[in-house]
């Protein structure tokens, strides 16, 4: 399977790539399928049922909102973030929904959108089924979709493929493992980012690749800036107060930013994840729950590394993408499948390796940094309090961003040789996730989620 860096870094809406971005894409795919089969005009009603983690924590993750907006044709990349909640309230109050913003039908929020808290479909914890009926009640179409992490969606026709779409694009330097990536780098003399650039040419010109990645970086910058300027209480009922803006004022007043670099990194990550928790526009990196780590380390690179420039940003994102693909291919980036180690752990690994790349590291040092970043996130559980992407998620991104910088610096002090390979740690992460109780995989039925009183 060919995966593009633009599959891993996609612009979307918070608070969750698997529970918000993925379901919105799935619902939109369903509505477009109705149009494609020329039955859209005959639809009188639709029903959606959410299973597993989508059902257990969907309300806290904004899944119902995402499904409704997706049915109306909204895309995660372009959805009106500011008006989304208002539109959902209009649907609830009026009992009317516009499929693809074209065909209006009746819709009961209570009866036509069902969340099963303890029922799971066989393939993946994030499953959802949609049905469409005509005026007589006859079924026009039914489809089951799985949101497999990072906004990636598969339907029931592609079960087992674990991808958005089957893509057999021929790449110049195909690889599936870290060992294969290192071998290609040695044979060609290319850096990991240069190898990735050659592969991305299968889909886009070099100018399109660079401009596309810099567009994504600008969205990350805007998200960080918003998070550092907005105050108040995050939505959802936990009454979690935004802290990034206050921290930014304090750090600016204290001066000497270089002496406080680690605090700035933490701040950048928390700013992004506060925006994500508020349902703002973010970039999956590779998921929304871990969306603050890569932007934070990129801000560290730009603001604290001498000689940093936009060319380095492009190289950083290409190298991060290469590492992310290894996790996507050989394990999982879904908290509902392997716990938070698959989200924050993968992002920490990607950021660590990418930073080593732009610090001038060899391919071996990049692989070493990525391995360190994942190794020290093994076993990390996903136990969001109240099913919200707030506690412990916001602080956890800050901690992991600092850890990523530390991992890169450690790797740069060595020659790239080490005992545990990236492939081994990815395999270990997958096995650890398989052994992990479902209580700790984005169901809010264990850990902090049951030991913290929601008030």
What are these model-predicted stretches?
Residues 18-35, 295-307, 352-360:
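Alpha-helical support elements that line or immediately flank enzyme active sites
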Residues 76-254:
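C-terminal regulatory domains involved in ligand/effector binding and gene-expression control
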Residues 1-11, 37:
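An N-terminal structural lobe/cap that precedes and organizes the functional/catalytic core
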Residues 419-455:
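Extended hydrophobic packing segments that form well-structured cores
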Residues 45-58, 90-97, 316-329, 371-384, ...:
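Short, mixed-charge aromatic SLiMs
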Residues 204-339, 447-455:
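Accessory "access/gating" subregions that flank catalytic or transport cores
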Residues 307-308, 319, 325-398, 410-419:
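Hydrophobic alpha-helical bundle architecture
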Residues 9-27, 278-297, 340-349:
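Conserved phosphate/anionic-ligand binding catalytic regions in large, soluble enzymes, centered on
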């Amino acid at each position: 399977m060919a995966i593009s860096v633009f599959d891993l870094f996609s612009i979307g809406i918070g608070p969750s790539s698997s529970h918000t971005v993925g379901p919105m894409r799935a619902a939109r795919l369903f509505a477009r399928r109705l149009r494609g089969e020329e039955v859209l005009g005959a639809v009188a009603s639709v029903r959606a049922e959410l299973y597993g983690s989508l059902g257990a924590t969907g309300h806290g993750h904004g899944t119902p909102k995402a499904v409704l907006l997706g049915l109306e044709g909204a895309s995660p990349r372009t959805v009106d973030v500011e008006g989304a909640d208002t539109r959902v309230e209009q649907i609830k109050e009026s009992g009317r929904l516009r499929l693809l913003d074209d065909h209006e039908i009746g819709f009961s929020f209570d009866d036509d959108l069902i969340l099963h808290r303890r029922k799971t479909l066989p393939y993946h914890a994030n499953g959802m089924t949609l049905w469409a009926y005509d005026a007589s009640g006859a079924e026009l179409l039914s489809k089951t979709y799985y949101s497999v992490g990072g906004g990636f969606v598969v339907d029931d026709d592609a079960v087992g493929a674990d991808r958005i779409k089957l893509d057999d694009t021929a790449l110049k330097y195909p690889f599936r493992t870290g060992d294969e990536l290192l071998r290609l780098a040695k044979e060609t003399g290319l850096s990991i980012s240069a190898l990735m650039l050659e592969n991305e040419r299968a889909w886009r010109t070099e100018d399109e690749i660079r401009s596309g990645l810099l567009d994504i970086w600008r969205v990350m910058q805007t998200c960080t800036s918003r998070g550092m300027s907005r105050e108040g209480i995050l939505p959802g009922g936990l009454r979690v107060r935004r802290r990034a803006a206050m921290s930014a004022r304090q750090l600016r007043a204290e001066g000497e930013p270089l002496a406080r670099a680690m605090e700035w990194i933490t701040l950048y990550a928390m700013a992004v994840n506060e925006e994500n928790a508020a349902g703002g526009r973010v970039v999956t990196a590779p998921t929304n729950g871990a969306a603050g780590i890569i932007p934070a380390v990129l801000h560290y690179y730009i603001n604290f590394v001498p000689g940093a420039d936009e060319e380095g940003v492009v190289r950083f994102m290409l190298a991060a993408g290469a590492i992310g693909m290894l996790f996507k291919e050989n394990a999982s980036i879904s908290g509902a499948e392997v716990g938070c180690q698959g989200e924050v752990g993968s992002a920490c690994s990607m950021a660590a390796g990418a930073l080593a790349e732009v610090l001038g590291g060899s391919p071996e040092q990049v692989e070493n940094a990525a391995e360190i970043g994942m190794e020290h996130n093994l076993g990390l559980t996903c136990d969001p309090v109240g099913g919200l992407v707030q506690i412990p998620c916001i602080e956890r991104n800050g901690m992991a961003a600092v850890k990523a910088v530390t991992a890169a610096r450690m790797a740069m002090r060595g020659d790239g040789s080490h005992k545990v390979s990236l492939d081994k740690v990815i395999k270990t992460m997958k096995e650890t996730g398989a052994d992990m109780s479902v209580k700790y995989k984005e169901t809010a039925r264990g850990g902090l989620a049951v030991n913290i009183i929601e008030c």
